[in-house]
Amino acid sequence: MKFIKYVLLAFIVLIIFFTVLVNYNLRDRHPDFNIDISLKNNGQISTISVGFAKMPITPDITDTWNDLNGNARYEPDKGDFYNDINGNNRFDPIWIGGFHNSRPAQGVHDDLWARVMVLDDGKTQLAIVSIDAVGFIYDDAVDIRKEVKKNIGCDYTIISSTHVHQAPDLIGIWGPSYFKSGVNKQYMQYVKKQTISAISTAVKNIVPAKLKIAQDLKGAIPFVVDSRDPQELDPGIRIIQALDINTEETLGSLVSWSNHPETLWSKNLLISSDFPHFFRSSIENGVFNEDTTLAEGIGGISVFINGAVGGLMTTNPSHPIPDPFNSTLHEGATFKKTQAQGQQLGLLALRALRSKDAKEISKSIISLRAKTITIPLDNTNFLLGFILGVIDHGTIGWFNVKTEIASIQVGPISIITIPGEIYPEIVNGGVVSPIGQDYNIDPIEIPPLRSMMKGEYKFVFGLANDEIGYIIPKSEWDEVPPYLYNHHKSPYGEINSLGPEAGPIIHSSIREILEY
């Protein structure tokens, strides 16, 4: 009898412990942070001032390891072992985010950055931040934004991830196992500190400027593929060059394109920002080799913002990239191929800026609409990750995730922010209701978001202030057989999405703020 009492007591203690753990890990990290901003400036236009800055967020690789079977997975049970370089008798890995678990970095190929462009019209100050990361969760973004609002004073801050798959895990799901986070807490704090410093420096660097805006909407089609039907891309390159209004010197640039920075693929073990590194460098310094200069750079600091990458947009090893200097076709997953890709993109952006179609403005006003929204968490794997603390993300209400959207207008430039990886058909059109769909419905996410945006230059900032995963048209959702287009298995995407309501909610919410 006494034994049964002890068992029951232990069971009750276990239930209490689990309940406390669940409530703690699912708590709203920022219950005081809810956005509903409307800055619709209808007054006199004024001079635009702009500032740029960048700060490194490259991790220190203290220990390396020996990958005996070359599969880019640290597997001690199969003979892999680490090199205790710092002599502390334990393995101190930096887990790379993207592709698969247990991929510790072996070194650094090129630096990672927090890069910032600040726009100021005299009334409203907007900070646009890009960090070289696979993703940055809303709660962590809010940590930075609260500090910025308190100590720097920007009216609105956008923190977008490049979604590079060769940088440290800042989400948690690419650690040593499915049940242990891959986030290094010290590195996370370093990223936050450096990002705040970059924003502060950019604000201090603000000077009156003119903006030169250009785009090439089709030239980059050969450098990206859609790995899921329907075949819909978002291939347009859009670029803003900011020049000191007095000296004509380039302060910096913001360039956007839509593709997964994963050209180096799954067996790369060196920290890198992938093709954005070469893209930014080409814009800043030009496209050249030891013999030939194909295009002069514009100088300044280039900020890369990713776009509609869902679907997913990729440059896989079998997709060739032509060398810009010769007839070589680069295949596989190499740095030469990744460099060629970045240089080709840089050429397109630079040529667009130098074309007769580029526009210039020196005066405008910033209009802004931003709003907190909630989306149901309908993904068992994500929920388990939240509960176990593998993903350090809170919920509100009955398993809802809090996130954010925004719409910005600066002269002919319009911007919408997306808190994840949106499918291009939601942005540009082409949502379908194919055979095999899980929900027997017509397309919901219509009309396309870009068709509702004003201005000539329509930027879509993906993974902005959050990374909620794939944002899939509900009429294309497919987890159970029969599968879409009579395929033999379900497509990739749903496994890394909050759920089927994410697409409709994001679309309707952005439509609402665009109609404001």
Residue ranges of each PLM-predicted region?
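Conserved beta-alpha junction segments in alpha/beta enzyme cores
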Residues: 4-9, 18-161, 167-329, 333-340, ...
